[in-house]
């Protein structure tokens, strides 16, 4: 789910150039929704797709992110925090998608949102599991599902939160 979340964040960040993208995972081997003769269940990758589809509408904001980095074997330095902000003018809503890619540490995040001072915190959705290889199955279809976090605080246009280690996050502010 973290890889899919980061991929979607990258697509959204480049929405000025990427006008269409295709999802190859529409067959049952690695589909977001799996089926069998007796039922259907959502894979963990379903949730970032759903969140991006529902809340990733509007204008992608040009944000400046200062984040710790790690050294990748192939591409040099890579950020631990992957994020994008979307302003949905039609619904007066700001959505922040964020992935904490750290395997070991939660991440404190602060955002200057004074331009959106009239907004209030609507919700902070988190998808994570202590076992990074955890999956949903037909026998246990809700093993990894989104939960709500109360770690996010919004005060005087400043947002402070903690993103759990290896987590997908959706933070929504509305008027």
Give residue spans per PLM region.
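Carbohydrate-binding surface patches
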Residues: 78-118, 124, 169
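Conserved, mostly hydrophobic/aromatic
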Residues: 21, 49, 96, 124, ...
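Beta-strand-rich interaction surfaces with strong enrichment in secreted/lumenal proteins
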Residues: 98, 158-161
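Short Pro-Gly-centered flexible turn/kink motifs
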Residues: 162-173
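Solvent-exposed, conformationally flexible loop/turn segments
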Residues: 104, 156-157, 165-166
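Active-site proximal loops enriched in glycine and acidic residues that flank catalytic Cys/His/Asp
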Residues: 22-25, 37, 64-65, 98-102, ...
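Acidic, Ser/Thr/Pro-rich beta/coil linker or hinge segments at domain junctions
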Residues: 117-159
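Aromatic/acidic polysaccharide-binding cleft in carbohydrate-active enzymes
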Residues: 1-83, 89-92
């Amino acid at each position: 789910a973290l890889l899919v979340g980061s991929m979607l964040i990258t697509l959204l960040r480049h929405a000025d150039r990427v006008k269409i993208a295709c999802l190859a995972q529409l067959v049952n081997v690695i589909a977001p929704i799996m089926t069998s003769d007796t039922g259907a269940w959502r894979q963990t990758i379903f949730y970032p797709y759903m969140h991006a589809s529902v809340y990733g509408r509007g204008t992608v904001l040009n944000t400046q992110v200062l984040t710790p980095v790690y050294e990748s074997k192939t591409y040099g330095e890579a950020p631990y925090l992957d994020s994008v902000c979307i302003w949905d003018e039609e619904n007066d809503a700001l959505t922040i998608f964020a992935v904490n890619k750290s395997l070991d540490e939660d991440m404190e995040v602060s955002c200057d949102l004074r331009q959106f001072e009239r907004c209030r915190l609507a919700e902070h959705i988190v998808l994570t599991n202590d076992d990074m290889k955890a999956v949903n199955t037909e026998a246990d279809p809700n093993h990894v599902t989104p939960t709500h976090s109360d770690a996010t605080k919004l005060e005087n246009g400043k947002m402070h939160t903690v993103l759990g280690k290896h987590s997908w996050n959706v933070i929504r502010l509305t008027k």
